[in-house]
């Protein structure tokens, strides 16, 4: 039997489809999410409804975003979930989560078993809507979860770590083996909870500046910041901020990146685009 077929649906590689089918894992994820009636629950990539069904059982309404036309059609005709669902058959990368929150009248609780081929860009898309989001629970490649939670002075620490922790508290929830999916992915998976900060611990004046600094630093992560960020900061400026110019990108904390961004915003602000 083709191990890419599950419940009569052929998993599509171009959509990064791996369908969750382990009942213990599913129950553990639903318990971690703890959905309640009246909340604005939004699922990204419901697939064959492994999470949609147990979450939907606890709710009166559930919004789902599914790119695959065939899977969206299956959900529309689902025997008991259908009437509860509002289905957006579109790419989550094009979704305006701010508008959706306004429509639903409250911050969103977002969850999903995310396609691994788009998980990182989708994270950055969601970070831009954290004002409209209460929390997020995602199944991701374990390596991506490691990067989300990583602290300075580790190989996993990178731009994703800094930006995720700038916007959210990041909490690992559960590790998941390949055997929990059909077809089994070639990598281990993990569930992570992201809770947007109610008050930013390190506010920045212009998020575009933080994005630029982290991009330039981590694109040249083996260089010292005196070299990788030499076009933005002098050695004297870094020293005045208490940041050692001999450090590399992975040695600098989220707080220090935010400090650098605010210095640049005040002294060399980006032009409005």
From Swiss-Prot:
The keyword Hydrolase does not apply. Its EC number is 2.1.1.182. S-adenosyl-L-methionine binds at residues 18, 20, 45, 66, 91, 113. It catalyses: adenosine(1518)/adenosine(1519) in 16S rRNA + 4 S-adenosyl-L-methionine = N(6)-dimethyladenosine(1518)/N(6)-dimethyladenosine(1519) in 16S rRNA + 4 S-adenosyl-L-homocysteine + 4 H(+). It is an enzyme of class 2 (transferase). One of its GO terms (cellular component) is cytosol. Its main location: cytoplasm. The keyword GTP-binding does not apply. It comes from the Bacteria. GO terms for molecular function: 16S rRNA (adenine(1518)-N(6)/adenine(1519)-N(6))-dimethyltransferase activity; RNA binding. Pfam families: RrnaAD. It is found in: Cytoplasm. Keywords: Cytoplasm, Methyltransferase, RNA-binding, rRNA processing, S-adenosyl-L-methionine, Transferase. InterPro entries: KsgA/Erm, rRNA_Ade_diMease-like_C, rRNA_Ade_Mease_Trfase_CS, rRNA_Ade_methylase_Trfase_N, rRNA_adenine_dimethylase, SAM-dependent_MTases_sf. Belongs to the class I-like SAM-binding methyltransferase superfamily. rRNA adenine N(6)-methyltransferase family. RsmA subfamily. Specifically dimethylates two adjacent adenosines (A1518 and A1519) in the loop of a conserved hairpin near the 3'-end of 16S rRNA in the 30S particle. May play a critical role in biogenesis of 30S subunits. This is Ribosomal RNA small subunit methyltransferase A. It comes from Salmonella schwarzengrund (strain CVM19633). The gene is rsmA.
């Amino acid at each position: 039997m083709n191990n890419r077929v599950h419940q009569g649906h052929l998993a599509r590689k171009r959509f990064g489809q791996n369908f969750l089918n382990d009942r213990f894992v599913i129950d553990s994820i639903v318990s971690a999410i703890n959905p309640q009636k009246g909340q604005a629950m939004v699922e990204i990539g419901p697939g064959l409804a492994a999470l949609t069904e147990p979450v939907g059982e606890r709710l009166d309404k559930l919004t789902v975003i599914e790119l695959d036309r065939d899977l969206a059609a299956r959900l529309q005709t689902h025997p008991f979930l259908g009437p509860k669902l509002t289905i957006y058959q579109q790419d989550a990368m094009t979704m305006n989560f701010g508008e959706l929150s306004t429509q639903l009248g409250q911050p969103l609780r977002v969850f999903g078993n995310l396609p691994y081929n788009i998980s990182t860009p989708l994270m950055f898309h969601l970070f831009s809507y954290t004002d409209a989001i209460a929390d997020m629970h995602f199944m991701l490649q374990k390596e991506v979860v490691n990067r989300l939670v990583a602290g300075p002075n580790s190989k996993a620490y990178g731009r994703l770590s800094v930006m995720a922790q700038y916007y959210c508290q990041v909490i690992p929830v559960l590790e998941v083996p390949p055997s929990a999916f059909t077809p089994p992915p070639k990598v281990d998976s993990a569930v992570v909870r992201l809770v947007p900060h109610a008050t930013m611990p390190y506010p920045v004046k212009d998020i575009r500046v933080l994005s630029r600094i982290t991009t330039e630093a981590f694109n040249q992560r083996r260089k010292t910041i005196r070299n990788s960020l030499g076009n933005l900061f002098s050695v004297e400026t870094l020293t005045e901020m208490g940041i050692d110019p001999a450090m590399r990108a992975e040695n600098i904390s989220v707080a220090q990146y935010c400090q650098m961004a605010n210095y640049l915003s005040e002294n060399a602000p980006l032009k409005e685009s």
